[in-house]
Design a protein with these regions (language model features):
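Extended beta-strand/beta-hairpin segments
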Residues: 1-84, 96-180
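Alpha-helical metal-binding/catalytic segments enriched in His/Glu/Asp
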Residues: 85-90
């Protein structure tokens, strides 16, 4: 199964981020490079496969499954939400790094797709030995910056991929504890 995240076109100059705030974040990170922040989310089942995810003081972030996976199709499924998190993290990194370099971003779009085998049906179906979860993820970045050559943007994309927290979660082992 291939999951494709829909794209939203943003054209013109992107709303600027606070360059002074960015510089302060950079200084804070350099001053205390070993700091670890714990992020939290509370997931509450609402019925069928629809779940409300409570993060900070924000409205709940809803995750559901499509009808083909017995859901009501009211929101992205968990795998799609994972792609959205990756795309958003990469986009934040691209925008922040462009601003840090003094670039003006006029266009930033990312198209993501990922391949996964869902025959295990969350452990209730075919549980023969095979990879579970995404086996391949592809991200296409369409970024334009005033006066910046495509080669420089490609180098920026590689840099951001290396330093993206969510991309690193995809590409390296993470300690995961699940219990009662």
């Amino acid at each position: 199964m291939t999951v494709v995240a829909q794209k939203t076109a943003l054209t013109g100059c992107l709303a600027p981020i606070d360059k002074n705030g960015l510089e302060q974040l950079i200084a804070n990170g350099k001053a205390n490079p070993k700091v670890v922040k714990t992020l939290k989310c509370k997931t509450v089942a609402e019925g069928k496969f629809r779940h409300a995810n409570y993060i900070r003081n924000l409205p709940p972030y809803i995750v559901d499954e499509p009808p083909g996976l017995l859901g009501d199709d009211t929101a992205p499924n968990p795998s799609e939400a994972s792609l959205a998190a990756l795309g958003s993290c990469l986009a934040v990194g691209l925008h922040a790094n462009a601003v840090h370099r003094g670039w003006t971003v006029s266009k930033l779009e990312l198209e993501l797709e990922g391949d996964l085998n869902i025959t295990a049906v969350w452990g209730t179906g075919d549980v023969s030995e095979k990879p579970v979860g995404f086996t391949d993820v592809r991200v296409k970045v369409d970024m334009e910056c005033e006066g910046i050559a495509p080669e420089e943007i490609s180098a920026l994309v590689a840099h951001v991929k290396k330093w993206s927290p969510v991309a690193n979660t995809y590409t390296r082992p993470v300690n995961l504890e699940v219990g009662i």
